[in-house]
């Protein structure tokens, strides 16, 4: 199937990580999925810790979501007009995400971030933006940059086709480095339109913020009249019903959302203070539009997902308990191999470098070959991890204690076989 796919699609995939290139395997092709499990086209079944990269917090094909999609599909799949689900979703987001007073739906996290940055530039009438190395905010040109050689180095393209001139307005800072971001603002503060950050980094593995890191960003952006944007595409409704901003009690000016709020269908949203959001067209001069924005199928899936979460008071407690059990089990099983597990709620990643991992430099020092061995071994025993050492595992509401224990048991077998030279 992969060879055929490569005839018609670049690299045989529609998103690079799906190619399994980082783990040096051909990708699996999914036939079906239910709950915590997926089945490939050869009828092999796996416990799935990808869960559509965190979008499926209820698990695959949850009855509530499927019923909502089926019901809406009978009423229409797309209108290009206003409909009640848009208002219902907006109200849920405003009532639960502390920073959001008004919100606009879009079709992806990339689109949400792109629009939020345009809005921040319009509001501040400044051009420069600050992002952090290791944080991913979609594939818009201004954010496809790497750090360069110095703390204050302006961005250089990290993708062919992105011009140096375009990303010259992007400053790349060091994640979790308070001194570095202070220096950036001392030098460029009056030029900075916004700072965008994953409040919990989730695209270089899971890297939680150090104490006072987010608060420092909040204080600096207020001092210099810049906009603070939290990219909560992963963390929104994942780590708490109030997102990471509620978890850490640091409230940004704008927030981007995605994944969970779409119930597994394509989605994005950005929102924030009314004063800022009222600049968006048609109310204001900042243009943003989308044919499928607020799509009724997506919002049916999303609203049903969020209602399920909000109506189950022990929802996050269950996820946390499952994730904690997995964290402790992996630490014990792989304790002889320099493993470090990072976890926030139901987001987990592990690194093989024997030390705490709280910066981009420490992330990339992890033993990627060890991860490849682990991935291949787990896959052979029906456990599907992310096919990259720098992505998060996600626990869903559908995962069971049995799933977690089976995963830990396989980790124990891997450890034993590795010691005996059988892996």
Swiss-Prot record:
A molecular-function term among this protein's GO annotations: transaminase activity
Pathway: Porphyrin-containing compound metabolism; protoporphyrin-IX biosynthesis; 5-aminolevulinate from L-glutamyl-tRNA(Glu): step 2/2
PROSITE patterns named among the record's database cross-references: AA_TRANSFER_CLASS_3 (PS00600)
One GO cellular component term: cytoplasm
E.C. numbers: 5.4.3.8
Signal peptide positions on this chain: none
UniProt keyword annotations, A-Z: Cytoplasm, Isomerase, Porphyrin biosynthesis, Pyridoxal phosphate
N6-(pyridoxal phosphate)lysine, modified sites: 259
Cofactor(s), by name: pyridoxal 5'-phosphate
Matching Gene3D superfamilies: Aspartate Aminotransferase, domain 1, Type I PLP-dependent aspartate aminotransferase-like (Major domain)
Localization per Swiss-Prot or TrEMBL: Cytoplasm
GO biological process terms on file: protoporphyrinogen IX biosynthetic process
Catalytic activity of the protein: (S)-4-amino-5-oxopentanoate = 5-aminolevulinate
HAMAP family, A to Z: HemL_aminotrans_3
Family per record: Belongs to the class-III pyridoxal-phosphate-dependent aminotransferase family. HemL subfamily.
Subunit text: Homodimer.
Identification of the protein by name: Glutamate-1-semialdehyde 2,1-aminomutase
